[in-house]
């Protein structure tokens, strides 16, 4: 059976491990997040080919 002191000890040990690791990893988290976004997310701001290369008939007339 775990006592309250065992639970507090586990919390302190986890804090001693994960706070320094998070502090050290914070400079590389943006690069990791951007890499994952490029692999798994849909490109939102890429225009389809139709809006980049229109035919002469579809273009607006110049005034």
UniProtKB/Swiss-Prot annotation:
Pfam family membership, one: CBP_BcsF
Subcellular location: Cell inner membrane
Biological process according to GO: cellulose biosynthetic process
GO cellular component entries: plasma membrane
TM region positions: 4-24
Disruption phenotype: When the bcsEFG operon is disrupted in a cellulose-synthesizing strain (a strain K12 / W3110 derivative called AR3110 with a restored, functional bcsQ gene), cellulose is no longer made.
InterPro entries per record: Cellulose_BcsF/YhjT
Lineage: superkingdom: Bacteria
This protein's UniProt keywords: Cell inner membrane, Cell membrane, Cellulose biosynthesis, Membrane, Transmembrane, Transmembrane helix
Topology in the lipid bilayer: Single-pass membrane protein
Main location: membrane
Family: Belongs to the BcsF family.
Miscellaneous comment in the UniProt entry for this protein: Cellulose production is abolished in E.coli K12 / MG1655 and W3110 due to a premature stop codon in bcsQ.
Protein name: Cellulose biosynthesis protein BcsF
Record organism: Escherichia coli (strain K12)
The encoding gene: bcsF
């Amino acid at each position: 059976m775990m006592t309250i002191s065992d639970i507090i000890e586990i919390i302190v040990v986890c804090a001693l491990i994960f706070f320094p690791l998070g502090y050290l990893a914070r400079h590389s988290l943006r690069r990791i997040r951007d890499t994952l976004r490029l692999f798994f997310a849909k490109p939102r701001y890429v225009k389809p080919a139709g809006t980049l290369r229109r035919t002469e008939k579809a273009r607006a007339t110049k005034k």
